[in-house]
């Protein structure tokens, strides 16, 4: 969100050396955000497996919002900050400020929706997740991420609601005494500061904390259940062991994904919390926060727009593979290996603690065949195809049965 870019009445501007350093830093931040978010969008569009994951719809929309922040907001802000002047007129100042509030709030809302999606995926039954996260509901959530921020951006800013009671202060701050020019100044009164900060940051932050806390508790319970299943299956037959191994892998994958998103949320809090705390405090202390503090907190928040793609690359294996394929021009080394005996999984109903149907792909006489069998899996784990090479007694029984039927 844009904030007062120059407090000329009580602060000195940046020196020549500082401007060169800042311009270099801003250029790196903007370039990193543009390339990184474009890479995320292209990766999901090209990778069919990434498109199958519902969470990635939010990630693509988030990348688009962060891309617009870099192109439409950061670039103009960097030019104004370095040159100590706003060239583009009062109307475009209002548009740019409104876009700033809209896009950064939309980015925060997307992170909140991602945390809720992961909560339903990990803490609820798979059937409950499918029923709740329908294509229609996902579309409504994505629409809300873009529409709701308009009510705290374009609507109040274009109507001047944020200026009520502080017009004189804004007029003093807009004028640059050194160059007889003006700045694009965005100041907010107390009601707008509280409303905007609560809607754009504090409510999403609270929802994310609650969601990730429940994810942590559920993942911890699942880890204990998996250990119990592994100990109980140590002396059992191979088929239950295979199911337990499959359940363990599934839960570890979900838990790792949750940890990745927790890191993303942690970076988001580190980047945006200083700004939103100051945004509420400043109107109550007569707007005495120094310009350079505002600049630092504002651009710390902007850095978050370029940080998310690199978090995906380093912490998410699927995205890392997709990025390598794109950057290495479809190098075959990074493509997913084909799955032998790939078939449609058996129809299952997954209920907490109930019996599930799993499909095994086994080798019989040099041919891969798919079969279904019942097994007890850990709670909240949906049945998926399992490929295994059966034991000798399995091969003997299954092949002899096939010969007798023929």
Swiss-Prot record:
Glycosylation sites (chain numbering): 7
TM region positions: 20-44, 55-78, 93-117, 134-157, 189-212, 258-283, 291-314
GO biological process annotation, one example: adenylate cyclase-activating G protein-coupled receptor signaling pathway
Subcellular localization, as worded in the UniProt entry: Cell membrane; Endosome membrane
Function: G-protein coupled receptor for 5-hydroxytryptamine (serotonin), a biogenic hormone that functions as a neurotransmitter, a hormone and a mitogen. Ligand binding causes a conformation change that triggers signaling via guanine nucleotide-binding proteins (G proteins) and modulates the activity of downstream effectors. HTR4 is coupled to G(s) G alpha proteins and mediates activation of adenylate cyclase activity.
Domain free text: Specificity for G(s) G alpha proteins is determined by the length of transmembrane regions 5 and 6 (TM5 and TM6).
Membrane topology annotation: Multi-pass membrane protein
Transmembrane is among the record's keywords: yes
Cysteine disulfide partners in this protein: 93-184
InterPro entries: 5HT4_rcpt (IPR001520), GPCR_Rhodpsn (IPR000276), GPCR_Rhodpsn_7TM (IPR017452)
Sections of the chain in a coiled coil: none
Alphabetical list of Pfam families matching this protein: 7tm_1
Subunit structure as annotated in this protein's UniProt entry: Interacts (via C-terminus 330-346 AA) with GRK5; this interaction is promoted by 5-HT (serotonin).
Cytoplasmic topology ranges: 45-54, 118-133, 213-257, 315-406
Source organism, top-level taxon: Eukaryota
Molecular function per GO: G protein-coupled serotonin receptor activity; neurotransmitter receptor activity; serotonin binding; serotonin receptor activity
Residue numbers on the Extracellular membrane side: 1-19, 79-92, 158-188, 284-290
Family of the protein in this entry: Belongs to the G-protein coupled receptor 1 family.
Protein's name in the database: 5-hydroxytryptamine receptor 4
Predominant place of localization: membrane
GO cellular component, one term: postsynapse
Keywords: Cell membrane, Disulfide bond, Endosome, G-protein coupled receptor, Glycoprotein, Membrane, Receptor, Transducer, Transmembrane, Transmembrane helix
Binding positions for serotonin per the UniProt entry: 100, 279
């Amino acid at each position: 969100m844009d904030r007062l870019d120059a407090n000329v009445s009580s602060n000195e501007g940046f020196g020549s050396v500082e401007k060169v350093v800042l311009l270099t830093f801003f250029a790196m931040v903007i370039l990193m955000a543009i390339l990184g978010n474009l890479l995320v969008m292209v990766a999901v569009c090209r990778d069919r497996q990434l498109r199958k994951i519902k969470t990635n719809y939010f990630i693509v929309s988030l990348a688009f919002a962060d891309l617009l922040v870099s192109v439409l907001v950061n670039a103009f802000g960097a030019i104004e900050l370095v040159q100590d002047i706003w060239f583009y007129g009062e109307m475009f100042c209002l548009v740019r400020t409104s876009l700033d509030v809209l896009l950064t709030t939309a980015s925060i809302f997307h992170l909140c929706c991602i945390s809720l999606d992961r909560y339903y995926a990990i803490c609820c039954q798979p059937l409950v997740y499918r029923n709740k996260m329908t294509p229609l509901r996902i579309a409504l959530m994505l629409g809300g991420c873009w529409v709701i921020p308009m009510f705290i951006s374009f609507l109040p800013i274009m109507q001047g609601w944020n200026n009520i009671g502080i017009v004189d202060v804004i007029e003093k701050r807009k004028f640059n005494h050194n160059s007889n020019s003006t700045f694009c100044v965005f100041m907010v009164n107390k009601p707008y500061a509280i409303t905007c900060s609560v809607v754009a940051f504090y409510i999403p932050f609270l929802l994310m904390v609650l969601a990730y806390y429940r994810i942590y508790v559920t993942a911890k319970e699942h880890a204990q259940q998996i250990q119990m299943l592994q100990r109980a299956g140590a002396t059992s037959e191979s088929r239950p062991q295979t199911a337990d191994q499959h359940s363990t892998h599934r839960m570890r994958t979900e838990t790792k994904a949750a940890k990745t998103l927790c890191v993303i949320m942690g970076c988001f809090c580190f980047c945006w919390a200083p700004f939103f705390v100051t945004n509420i405090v400043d109107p109550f202390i007569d707007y005495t926060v120094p310009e350079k503090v505002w600049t630092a907190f504002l651009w710390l928040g902007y850095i978050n727009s370029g940080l998310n793609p690199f978090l995906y690359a380093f912490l998410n294996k699927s995205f890392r593979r997709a990025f390598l394929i794109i950057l290495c021009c479809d190098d075959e080394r990074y493509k997913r290996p084909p799955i032998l005996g790939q078939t449609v999984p058996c129809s299952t109903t997954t209920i907490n603690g109930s019996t599930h149907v799993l499909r095994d792909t086994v080798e019989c006489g040099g041919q891969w065949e798919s079969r279904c069998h019942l097994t007890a899996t850990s709670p909240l784990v949906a049945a998926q195809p399992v490929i295994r090479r059966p034991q000798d007694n399995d091969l003997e029984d299954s092949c002899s049965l096939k010969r007798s039927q023929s």
